[in-house]
């Protein structure tokens, strides 16, 4: 048995992954480790041990710019019923400065399985009108105490997927096409856990002049379901034939593991969106600053940084209403986000100090709706706002719970009419 043409990683190299424009050994090891875990999801078996490794080919002279796209192609060769050779090849993608796809390293792994069940490969299909923008795993650093992926890492992986798309869009123009995410909405569907393998797939809702609206699905290979749905509005610089380039990319055949091709529009937000201005009774829920490790490809604070601030703000916000650490620990209570709707207004450069101001916009029997505004401490300008629908969650029973009256009473003092 020999199977090839599987993509087991698609991501972006950041400034910390390279040294003198070459991929670091530590980054190569990390990428290959992710590809191995992704491969286990593909064959639906976890190996017991790696019994042999061998570098088959390596090019240490591949010149890599920060935020270039890379991918891993994988081949499987069955040696016997409990032994398989997995060959991973890391490639630098074609780009506006790199005229061809270049092999960085090809490495063989021979792995052993105690499970004698036959290998059951997940199929991949060629489809049009979509773009497979990201393939990777849920890492330990992405997870909370229950080994579920934290909210900010959905946004981090989605940001990587968007950068991969625009790296390909930029190829004909011989420069990086500048773009800005204006709005981003995420509806969470199913939890994903440590070492789950994910693919992010884009579909165009519309593209016109200098604006693109995308629908996205986070497909979990292990659970064979959609874990999250995104809608994103992106503005980009105007270039001749750019819209044609975007359409051509989506019309070309793309390999995907997604078994259902159905991109409905997300349900509309209920109630009127609160204004951009901060309410006079808003609660100061978080103070942060943009550090070097918070910067993205544009040298500004990333969506991961911003949504990470939101997670901290929500903890402080719920604590002031009585859902503090002691109460949550005593009754084994957590919280779960259902819907995030973000509007980005300004960038957050290195060294900017920001504050989060929070209000409830609706307090239901089980659900809570609230808004956070991120503010530049120096100028008072609004950086972004985000409206969230969430529930308190019984961690033992795995169900949402009725909001306690004591919580409601305190939350009502922070409620704004909407």
What are these regions, as identified by a protein language model?
Residues 28-31, 44-47, 62-64, 156, ...:
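Short secondary-structure boundary/capping segments within folded domains
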Residues 43-51, 172-179, 327-335:
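Short, basic/aromatic beta-hairpin or loop at an interaction surface
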């Amino acid at each position: 048995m020999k199977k090839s043409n599987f993509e087991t990683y698609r991501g972006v190299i950041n400034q910390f992954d390279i040294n003198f424009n070459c991929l670091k050994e530590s980054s190569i090891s990390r990428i290959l480790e992710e590809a191995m875990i992704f491969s286990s999801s593909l064959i639906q078996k976890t190996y017991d041990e790696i019994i042999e490794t061998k570098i088959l080919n390596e090019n240490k002279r591949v010149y890599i710019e920060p935020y270039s796209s890379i991918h891993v192609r994988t081949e499987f060769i069955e040696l016997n019923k409990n032994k398989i050779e997995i060959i991973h090849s890391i490639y630098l993608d074609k780009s506006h400065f790199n005229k061809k796809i270049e092999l960085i390293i090809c490495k063989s792994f021979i792995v052993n399985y105690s499970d004698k069940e036959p290998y059951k490969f997940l199929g991949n299909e060629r489809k049009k009108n979509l773009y497979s923008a990201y393939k990777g795993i849920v890492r330990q650093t992405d997870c909370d105490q229950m080994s579920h992926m934290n909210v900010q890492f959905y946004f981090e992986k989605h940001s990587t997927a968007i950068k991969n798309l625009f790296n390909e869009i930029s190829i004909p123009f011989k420069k990086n096409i500048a773009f800005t995410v204006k709005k981003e909405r995420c509806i969470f569907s199913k939890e994903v856990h440590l070492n789950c393998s994910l693919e992010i797939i884009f579909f165009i809702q519309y593209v016109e002049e200098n604006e693109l609206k995308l629908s996205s699905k986070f497909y979990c290979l292990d659970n064979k379901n959609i874990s999250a749905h995104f809608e994103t509005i992106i503005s980009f610089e105007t270039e001749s034939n750019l819209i044609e380039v975007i359409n051509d990319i989506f019309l070309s055949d793309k390999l995907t593991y997604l078994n259902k091709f159905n991109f409905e529009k997300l349900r509309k937000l209920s109630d009127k969106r609160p204004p951009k201005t901060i309410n006079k009774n808003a609660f100061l829920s978080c103070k942060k600053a943009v550090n070097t490790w918070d910067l993205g490809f544009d040298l500004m604070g990333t969506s991961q940084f911003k949504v990470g601030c939101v997670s901290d703000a929500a903890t402080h916000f719920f604590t002031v209403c009585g859902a503090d650490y002691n109460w949550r620990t005593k009754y084994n209570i957590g919280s779960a986000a259902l819907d995030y709707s973000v509007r980005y207004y300004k960038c957050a450069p290195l060294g900017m100090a920001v504050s989060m101001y929070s209000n409830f916009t609706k307090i239901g029997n089980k659900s809570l709706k609230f808004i956070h505004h991120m503010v530049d401490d120096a100028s008072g300008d609004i950086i972004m706002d985000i409206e969230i629908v969430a529930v308190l969650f019984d961690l033992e029973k795995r169900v949402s719970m009725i909001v306690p009256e004591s919580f409601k009473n305190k939350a009502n003092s922070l409620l704004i009419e909407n």
